[in-house]
Amino acid sequence: MPKVSVVIPIYGVEKYIERCAVSLFEQTLHDIEFVFVDDCTPDHSIEILKQVIEKYRPCFEEKNYAVRIERMSSNSGLPTVRRHGVSLCSGEYVTHCDSDDWVAPYLYVMLYKVAMRTDADMVMCGYNMTDGA
C-alpha cells in the first residue's frame, strides 16, 4: 500500500504541468501513488505529462512510485474530478495537488512523518503564492 496518494486534476495546464509533475516525481518520500485525472483537457497537457513520465520512469521502481492517468468520460469540473481521483486511491493518506502548482521535494516526507509521529488522521501545511503572470 502506498504511504501517500496524490490526486492531480488536469485541465488547461499545458504551461504548468511539466513543473508540477517534475516536483512530484522528485519527492524524497518513497511509496507514493500519483493519480492524474484528465478532465478532457483541450490542450497538450497530457502529451506534456506523458513526456515527463517517460523521463522520470527509471526512478519509479527505485522509489516505488505508482503513476496513472485516468480520463473522465466528459468534462466534469474540479469537484467531480477530485472525487473520482480519490475513489481510485489506495494510499494510507490522500492529498491533492493542483496541476498549476509545484511542491518542495521534501513536502510529502515531512507531512507523512508528522502524521506517523502524532497518529494524525489529517495534517496540514502552509504554502506560498507566487504571481505566475
Across the structure, where does each feature detected by a protein language model lie?
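Nucleotide-sugar donor-binding/catalytic module of glycosyltransferases
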Residues: 1-133
